[in-house]
């Protein structure tokens, strides 16, 4: 496990544009992924994650161009996810300049795909994204289930068991998003993050719910995550990545400044 904990801004890209508003001061065009990625690079982000939320295959080529463009100008690791369904998709993204590729629903429909991708390209560049919702009634032991389609469709798969299975199949990292917390700005689901982190040996990236800098710190100290991912806290200019790192350092968390 790396000692320094990572901060990863996340950008949703739709048809080649960053969506979920980005409000940087003095950025010419807040919708341009290259501009936004460069700004995060300058702020000291450890990595950047692009999630392509473009629905149609016709527009899929656009994300490839975005990745090529960003990779040519930004030199921190780049993870790309969204619509990755085949070995060819993984190869295309890696060839375009992505360092890692995140596999989400395709892993659920075909777990062997994860193993094949890891065997083909190496575990270090395969991230499995886990979208989980708490399903246990109040007062009962915590239980989370995997949901697909943006948290609308349940699968009946236990999130913690799934995380262990993905590790066994070779995944290099797990991106764990709480669908309950996503967009709430009320902090990570720390119990979910911690339970998965403590169940696997590979790094876990905490995602979903960051509203303030202390939430990022909690993801590491209480959630036992190796990295924390956030979107709007950075996009809306509330905080810079540097401020987040300083807050983490104050908490005794080792970061790369």
Curated annotation (Swiss-Prot):
GO molecular function: imidazoleglycerol-phosphate synthase activity; lyase activity
Main location (coarse class): cytoplasm
Location(s), subcellular: Cytoplasm
Keyword DNA damage (UniProt): no
Record: active site: 12, 131
GO cellular component, one term: cytoplasm
Matching CDD domains: HisF
Main enzyme class: lyase
Keywords: Amino-acid biosynthesis, Cytoplasm, Histidine biosynthesis, Lyase
Pathway the protein contributes to: Amino-acid biosynthesis; L-histidine biosynthesis; L-histidine from 5-phospho-alpha-D-ribose 1-diphosphate: step 5/9
Example GO biological process: L-histidine biosynthetic process
Enzyme Commission number(s): 4.3.2.10
Reaction catalysed by this enzyme: 5-[(5-phospho-1-deoxy-D-ribulos-1-ylimino)methylamino]-1-(5-phospho-beta-D-ribosyl)imidazole-4-carboxamide + L-glutamine = D-erythro-1-(imidazol-4-yl)glycerol 3-phosphate + 5-amino-1-(5-phospho-beta-D-ribosyl)imidazole-4-carboxamide + L-glutamate + H(+)
Pfam families referenced in this protein's UniProt entry, alphabetically: His_biosynth (PF00977)
Entry function: IGPS catalyzes the conversion of PRFAR and glutamine to IGP, AICAR and glutamate. The HisF subunit catalyzes the cyclization activity that produces IGP and AICAR from PRFAR using the ammonia provided by the HisH subunit.
Family, per entry: Belongs to the HisA/HisF family.
Summary of subunit composition and partner proteins: Heterodimer of HisH and HisF.
Name of the protein this chain belongs to: Imidazole glycerol phosphate synthase subunit HisF
Organism: Hydrogenovibrio crunogenus (strain DSM 25203 / XCL-2)
Taxonomic lineage: Bacteria, Pseudomonadati, Pseudomonadota, Gammaproteobacteria, Thiotrichales
